[in-house]
């Protein structure tokens, strides 16, 4: 197959020093992952064991009312629970009994830890084991933490998927596993492209239903669709599955490279690959070219938020003509984002973790044309004359693969255009 143009090793950021700082950080907690996971897993329920603050976060972030009976809820820890005056395990059993009696459609129940449950050391793993014995085989009960003490924004999904891997059945079937929650229409596009190349069987984690025929074994190869799945990556390898390292499928170049790694693994010939990808590649290039006109020559600064930052910086610098000043990520897992680091030209500061005050100082000194940051930082930076993009939008908006490449570029070009218009109006 014809190789993608690659930067020489000395030109990429694979060996660039990583600035590691620890201090005050500004991120959402991992509970926010429930917002997209509950839509993907149609027979699952996410029961957060937490405070009223946790409940308000989920309800407002999801944009649904509780009377609509979504597939998530909160078991409220009262003052008696927090003070140790009540048996929290017994109270949790009562809540789960009531929930499963009312919602007979639930086949997977996730007990989700929060800051309050972590503080009082409530052992949800023990509760999950106890409930699994009680409700099996009708309901599978698992647990993971979405606590802000332990997790950042997107780590909730990682913790959820990692909790599922050990209980998946063993299979010896040669198969491809796509790992990471994607919007249904995006997932269908990816699967369709791979199937047109003759690749199969293709499985997806998370599967929409617990009874889906999904197993893991030594003949399973997996490709990550999200760069924040470090724990899931490790859990799959411990089950014998093999990772296919690749750039992440953002933009035309990243999508083509991601597909090519899989195609090479399954012996797809160059003509077939070209036939399947030529048209969508051309559409993606055209869409990116139109959407990124305002981005060329502009500078960008990433605060750490979702772990999407390094792949997105690669896309914006190589396909949209931007210059990255700093690319901050909560974690830099080179086994996962190594290919993107290799393709990211030397120059930007690569930072892991956060001391938000020090990072704000660097951002103010650099005065980038666009700053990607969390909601809490956006308004203050806008007030200082810096254009911003909410990092959360990059997770909740379909941005993967060819057909969304133009939309991805547009997410960054719109605030840059808006800032330009505001400057013109101010000058007048």
UniProtKB/Swiss-Prot annotation:
Pathway(s) the chain acts in: Porphyrin-containing compound metabolism; bacteriochlorophyll biosynthesis (light-independent)
Record: residues binding [4Fe-4S] cluster: 29, 54, 115
Enzyme class at the top of the EC tree: oxidoreductase
This enzyme's EC code(s): 1.3.7.7
Signal peptide extent: none
Cofactors: [4Fe-4S] cluster
TM regions (residue ranges): none
Gene3D superfamilies, per the entry: Nitrogenase molybdenum iron protein domain
GO biological-process terms attached to the record: light-independent bacteriochlorophyll biosynthetic process; photosynthesis, dark reaction
Cofactor binding note from Swiss-Prot or TrEMBL: Binds 1 [4Fe-4S] cluster per heterodimer. The cluster is bound at the heterodimer interface by residues from both subunits.
InterPro entries, per database record: LIPOR_BchN/ChlN, Nase/OxRdtase_comp1, Protochl_reductN
Keywords recorded for this protein, A-Z: 4Fe-4S, ATP-binding, Bacteriochlorophyll biosynthesis, Chlorophyll biosynthesis, Iron, Iron-sulfur, Metal-binding, Nucleotide-binding, Oxidoreductase, Photosynthesis
Catalytic activity: chlorophyllide a + oxidized 2[4Fe-4S]-[ferredoxin] + 2 ADP + 2 phosphate = protochlorophyllide a + reduced 2[4Fe-4S]-[ferredoxin] + 2 ATP + 2 H2O
Main function: Component of the dark-operative protochlorophyllide reductase (DPOR) that uses Mg-ATP and reduced ferredoxin to reduce ring D of protochlorophyllide (Pchlide) to form chlorophyllide a (Chlide). This reaction is light-independent. The NB-protein (BchN-BchB) is the catalytic component of the complex.
Family: Belongs to the BchN/ChlN family.
UniProt protein name: Light-independent protochlorophyllide reductase subunit N
